[in-house]
Amino acid sequence: MPSTPADAKGLLKSAIRDDDPVIFIEQERMYGNKGEVPDDTDFTVPLGVADVKREGTDATIVARSLMVPVALKAAEVLEKEGVSCEVIDPRTIRPLDIDTIVESVKQTNRVVVAEESHPFCGVGAEISAEIMTRAFDYLDAPVRRVSGADVPMPYAKNLEERAIPGVEQLVAAVREIAYMD
């Protein structure tokens, strides 16, 4: 699930070239996003390799697709409060680069998993479960999930924006696991 135009190009090319079946999921709200895209016709992004979008020391935010820019904005807000957040974009969910996520959690000891989808049976739930299984002894706070509202996704833009988590929710979640509130 790409979060940047470059990732969209690179992941799609990798999906096409892969010998196994691949489901490529795009976030429609990101179609108008602009950004750097390599001119290299052979540019690919390897499947199953996460991207550390921002390094940090106090908390890890795992976010995919539409939530990556939100997580980066939340990290900027929190930096002004003295909290350094690492932002990880898994980019693919199967294979999932859980090792990069776990290594970050081992360093920061706190994690928020952010996703726009429903809280029940979401990818964020699986990522949270994997973190609990592989990095429980490193956690100084419970894994905190921030997900979309548990409602059918509305088509009206104003309602859709209310159903998807924003910067404020992510900032509040990090403050909670950092015991700032």
Q: Residue locations for each model-derived region?
A:
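Residue-level detector of structured alpha->beta connecting loops
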Residues: 19-20, 109
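Short, surface-exposed beta-edge/turn micro-motifs
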Residues: 20-21, 58
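Conserved thiamine diphosphate
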Residues: 1-18
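Thiamine diphosphate
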Residues: 28-181
